[in-house]
Every structure is written in structure tokens, then in C-alpha cells.
Amino acid sequence: ELKGQDVGGEAGGDRAEPTRFKGPAVETISFEADLDATDQLEFPDQHAATVAHGLAPQIALLESLSQPSSAQLSKVNSQASSGQLEIAPMLAPLLLLVWGASRVIPVELTSVSVTGEACDPVLNPIHAKASFGLRVLTVDDLGFASKGGALFMTYLQNREQLAAKAQPVSLSTLGVTGV
């Protein structure tokens, strides 16, 4: 979903400037993924970790992307206990959604939901569905000089190049005349 950031389009906005942008659009991406350990379980000698834990390590990794690490939390607690004040929030890693070589997108994970659908005899998940909500991070979030900002600009330029390949349609083709 793309939501334009125009100057006059929102309540309280400048109605005299409805066609001016104030920054990149707010873009959100949602998708689902099927996680399945069946193929790995077919060759147990080659996939001992999957036999021992199923999909639990992959699920734990996905879930860990949405919160600070225990080490970060312990450090903040230790600093607070010693009277130090941390003003800046804890840094999250720069997440990239890679949909091919021309679509490398810096994103923030806004939601992740994993539903286990099948387990092995010791209740390790072996089939699950994961739903993701992402917000594309732009130069407004990351700045132009950062690696993430440069990746966003490349993503935007690649999209513009793709859009330029679309065949234009005249208004008369759509039945509009006299404009």
C-alpha cells in the first residue's frame, strides 16, 4: 500500500497546495510465507538441527527481528541502575527485503505472526505460516547519506525506470474527449 504525503490532502493541510508532495510516500508491504521442514526431514543426516528442533530456530529468528536483544535490555537496565541516562533508543539492525536484484528495500518490521500448523512427535514445529507487515524506510527516516537511504533511492529509481517502460494510454482511448 502506498500513501502519498501531499501537502494539502489531509485534514488541516494546506488546501491551496493539493498537488505538492512533502516527501516520499508511506509504503507498507504485507505478505505471508509458508515455512516447511518436510524436505529437510527427508534427509535427517544432512539436517540434524531440523531433526532436533524443527522450524523453531527459524521462527525464533523471525520473532527476534521485532524487539531488542536480551543483551541490549540488560545493558540499558545496568546503565539505569548505575544512574546513567540513555537518551537515544536502542538501535535496531537495518532490515532489507530482497525481492530480486533490483528490489532491495530497507524496511521496518511492523508485525510478524507465526501460526504453527504441524508438529513432530516432540512438538517441534515442522510446518508454519508466517505473516509479515513491513513499512518501507525512506530518506525521511534514514537520511540521504546512510546506506539505507542510498538503498531506498536505488529502489525508487528502479521503480521509476520500470514505470517508464509502461505503455502510455491516451484519454481518447478511455473515451474521454474535449479535455
Model regions: which residues?
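Acidic, Ser/Thr- and Gly-enriched intrinsically disordered low-complexity segments
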Residues: 1-179
